[in-house]
């Protein structure tokens, strides 16, 4: 099942290291089937506060996303970003194409006290 590596980059500032990171990241993703879904840009905040921007990278599955993140190639370039940008990174699993939130709501409803 598809998975996503998501990073919230708070107040990113461009510098030579960050540009080098951007230039090199695709080569680290290719062996794991990663592709950018969202790569920064303006965020249209509708609820709450959201300082910064977001990056979303799609992978074939959670194992591929984790293997990419933990790979020596990615770990080598990671400090180029993390030394300059305050961020949070995570991996989440997607839902199947036929996902119906009503089934989830029904399961949760069954857990509620009567």
Could you tell me what each predicted segment is?
Residues 63-98:
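A contiguous, mid-protein "functional segment" used to position or interact
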């Amino acid at each position: 099942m598809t998975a996503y590596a998501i990073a919230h980059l708070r107040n990113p500032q461009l510098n030579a290291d960050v540009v080098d990171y951007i230039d090199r990241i695709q080569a680290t993703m290719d062996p794991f089937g990663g592709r950018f879904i969202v790569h920064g840009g303006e965020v249209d905040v509708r609820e709450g506060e959201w300082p910064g921007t977001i990056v979303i990278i799609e992978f074939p599955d959670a194992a591929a996303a984790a293997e990419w993140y933990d790979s020596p190639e990615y770990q080598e370039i990671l400090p180029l970003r993390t030394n300059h940008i305050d961020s949070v990174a995570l991996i989440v699993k997607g839902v199947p194409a036929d996902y119906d939130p009503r089934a989830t709501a029904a399961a949760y409803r069954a857990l509620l006290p009567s």
